[in-house]
Amino acid sequence: EPEECRLQKESSNKTDFLTVHGLWPALPKSIAARGVDERRWMRFGCATRPVPNMPEAKASRKCDAAETGLSLTGAAKLNSVMPGAGGNSCLERYEYAKHGVCFGFDPDAYFGTMVRMNQEVKHSAAGKFLAENYGKTVRRSDFDAAVAKSWGKQSVKAFKLTCHGNPAYLTEMQISLNASTINNPLSAGSFAPQPHPGNCGKQFVIDKAGY
């Protein structure tokens, strides 16, 4: 278990627990045209063969990935929302090597977009709902209503929730976005529907720090 999870501490501001995993570009048409499917693309990212065929970043050896070139200012901002960045975990190196480097993304722009969107979600009705129900069992329908209040009813289908355990604990939230809107503040037009809502069922627990 990563030390940032094991050593997690309580915070009076519960939105602090809404953290970033990454920003993953979908399969580009130019790469799909070379016979690559979505599943292979999401597994290998920039290391996908025959293209882009860059060095593979391994999840078990994140710190072996090249440094990102992120500025000190950018790194400080990222560290506040991505607990696995820097330190002994090197999550930001892994994420950039797998999902960013083959697009030539400027590291400060790429990670800066993650930081900005994280703040926008935290300040939304959906973020406030998660914070206000910290440690509690909630209904999926109430979560969906908070998302709809934030960005409109059509945005609900963009949220895929992953849960583990019995009772079901919310462990991840994947949000599907339109690439053309990525540099704009989140709005009704930002979201793209996903085919599956996730495995969380009708209710789930919003976990809290500690065991």
PLM features per residue range, with description:
Residues E4-Y211:
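Domain-level detector of nuclease and nuclease-like folds
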